[in-house]
């Protein structure tokens, strides 16, 4: 099944793309950071089309939990800030919701 890989890839691409804008506007990096950033955001959008879902909104809703987990991973691994218990508790709640959306018996 391609859905888990598509969600993880989309999360990495979205976070990297958004971070390029953050780096430019908040960290004073060159405007050229936007070139790979925009390519990364385009890859993010493409990867979400690979998700096994009949409805875009449902795919995006389920993706939200994955995005939150990936964002906390970025926080820790790239920015060097360890997520606290509130970060982790909130992420767990969202991830449970994403799993319910993914595996629930939906009507088409």
Swiss-Prot record:
Keyword hit for Ligase: no
Domain of life assignment: Bacteria
Protein name: UPF0060 membrane protein Nwi_1459
Gene Ontology CC: plasma membrane
NCBIfam families: PRK02237.1
HAMAP family associated with the record: UPF0060
Keyword ATP-binding: no
Transmembrane segments: 5-25, 31-51, 61-81, 88-108
Family listed: Belongs to the UPF0060 family.
Key words, A-Z: Cell inner membrane, Cell membrane, Membrane, Transmembrane, Transmembrane helix
PANTHER family, per the entry: UPF0060 MEMBRANE PROTEIN YNFA (PTHR36116:SF1)
InterPro entries assigned: UPF0060 (IPR003844)
Pfam families named among the record's database cross-references: UPF0060 (PF02694)
Membrane-topology annotation of the record: Multi-pass membrane protein
Localization annotation: Cell inner membrane
């Amino acid at each position: 099944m391609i859905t888990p890989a598509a969600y993880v890839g989309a999360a990495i691409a979205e976070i990297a793309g958004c971070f390029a804008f953050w780096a430019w506007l908040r960290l004073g990096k060159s405007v050229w950071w936007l070139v790979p950033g925009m390519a990364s955001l385009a890859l993010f959008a493409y990867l979400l089309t690979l998700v096994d879902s009949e409805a875009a909104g449902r795919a995006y809703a389920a993706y939200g939990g994955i995005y939150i987990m990936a964002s906390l991973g970025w926080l820790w691994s790239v920015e060097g800030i360890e997520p606290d218990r509130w970060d982790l508790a909130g992420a767990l709640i969202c991830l449970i919701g994403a799993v319910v959306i993914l595996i629930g018996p939906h009507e088409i």
